Amino acid sequence: MSNVDINHARALVYQLLSSLFAREVNAQRLQELTSDAAQQFWTQLGHEPEFSAPVATMQKVLNDLQRNDALLELAADYCGLFLVGTRHSASPYASLYLNSEDEPLLFGQQHQQMSEFLHQSKLQVQSHFPEPADHLAVMLAYMGHLACHSEDAAQLNFLDACIDSWLAKFVVKVVECDSKHRNGFYSALASLTLAWVKQDKQLLEQTINSSVEQTLS
């Protein structure tokens, strides 16, 4: 597989993770996520030992969501976890995990920083997604963009400074708040995202180090 193909595959994973944090799963999205092509994708992703458990959980939940009431229940889980700003929710904004203030403000430093990244890449948050730019879905989507349009060093810098710096804290909060829900879909999604980011970061580090060694040899 060429570097272009690898980066395209990486971008697809980032876009998938982004989409699942961006909005609840509706009937149309469910059909896409359970199609034959999607099942092959999930199976391939689940072959990696670090991803197998969360992928299996997510596949099972998605395949069981054939009842309308089950789909509504998952949508309610999404709302309760990510849209309701209480101690029992897991707000997906970097500023809430990176700032030391007792009550960090949305649209603060991390939002401004992310907005500048988007501006430099001639991108912007779409109007139908009225969220601060430091929302995890925006950052994952941007990382997917970088995977196909930026050098490895730039990708690693963004991944390390803007996502990996707070993702583990967010995942702990998701798992804690999602524990009362039986299917555990969003706990699995959060765990998969963290595992993916860790592995991708390692891949980028290895690629950069290999390039340096080739240059010096």
Swiss-Prot record:
GO biological process terms held by the UniProt record: protein complex oligomerization; protein folding; protein maturation
UniProt keywords, alphabetically: Chaperone, Cytoplasm
Predominant cellular place of this UniProt entry's protein: cytoplasm
InterPro entries to which the protein is assigned, alphabetical: Chaperone_TorD, DMSO/NO3_reduct_chaperone, HscB_C_sf, TorD-like_sf, TorD/DmsD_chaperones
Subcellular location: Cytoplasm
Pfam family, one: Nitrate_red_del
Key word Metal-binding present: no
Any one Gene Ontology cellular component term annotated for this protein: cytoplasm
Function: Involved in the biogenesis of TorA. Acts on TorA before the insertion of the molybdenum cofactor and, as a result, probably favors a conformation of the apoenzyme that is competent for acquiring the cofactor.
Family, similarity comment: Belongs to the TorD/DmsD family. TorD subfamily.
Record's protein name: Chaperone protein TorD
Organism: Shewanella oneidensis (strain ATCC 700550 / JCM 31522 / CIP 106686 / LMG 19005 / NCIMB 14063 / MR-1)
